[in-house]
């Protein structure tokens, strides 16, 4: 019988797993700090170590189950949240190939390029998504294209960190509007990605996951996850 709910949060400075009763009472929480390493080649960069950090996330999930003594079979649902604006890129096989935290600031030159290419684009992005260039995915994807073309060419999918958690637990790529819009490549009114924005500056289209509204069951946790 389903008795509890789990939330997993990939925050800026830490990851945590929290268990709640069906009435919303917090039953337990386990948290692990993580650090984002600067690539010495690129000032302002903050790389995300997906291998180590997934180990930390898993340890939090196991830890809160042990802390509370809850039977995993009695967890009715798992939801994910995360730091805004951080992104993960994947290749055609679904393997992570590049990721940066939300505090990454390496794409200053790309912001200047975007302004030069189209002085009105940032205003248009803000009208549609509520996002500006600051911390958004658009300049970062442009940076990867300019500075790491071999990674860019392999990129087949781009997700936010709450989407990454879902993918690691289920093998399914999915996203939701409240965080997808922080990419700046999203139309909040239509509740979907705006490929037109990406195409207007020569970026790939079709590399973002299917959108589902918050609260939608998008997949089931598998044994691998």
Question: How would you name each of these model-derived features?
Answer:
Residues 1-99, 154:
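N-terminal glycine/serine-rich phosphate-binding loop of ATP-dependent small-molecule kinases
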């Amino acid at each position: 019988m389903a008795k509890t709910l789990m939330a997993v949060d990939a925050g800026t400075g830490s990851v945590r797993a929290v268990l709640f009763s069906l009435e919303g009472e917090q039953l337990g929480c386990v948290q692990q700090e993580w650090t984002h390493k600067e690539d010495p080649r690129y000032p302002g960069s903050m790389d995300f170590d997906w291998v180590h950090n997934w180990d930390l996330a898993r340890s939090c999930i196991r830890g809160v189950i042990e802390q509370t003594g809850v039977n995993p079979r009695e967890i009715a649902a798992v939801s994910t949240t995360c730091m805004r604006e951080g992104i993960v890129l994947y290749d055609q096989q679904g393997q992570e190939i590049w990721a940066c935290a939300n505090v990454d600031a390496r794409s200053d030159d790309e912001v200047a390029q975007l302004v030069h290419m189209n002085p009105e684009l940032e205003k248009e992005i803000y009208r549609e998504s509520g996002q500006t260039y600051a911390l958004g995915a658009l300049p970062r994807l442009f940076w990867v294209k300019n500075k790491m073309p071999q990674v860019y060419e392999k990129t087949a999918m781009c997700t936010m960190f709450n989407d990454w958690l879902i993918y690691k637990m289920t093998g399914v790529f999915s996203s939701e509007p409240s965080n997808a819009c922080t990419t700046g490549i999203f139309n909040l009114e239509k509740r979907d990605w705006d490929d037109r924005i990406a195409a207007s500056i020569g970026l790939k289209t079709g590399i973002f996951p299917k959108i589902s509204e918050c609260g939608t069951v998008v997949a089931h946790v598998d044994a691998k996850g």
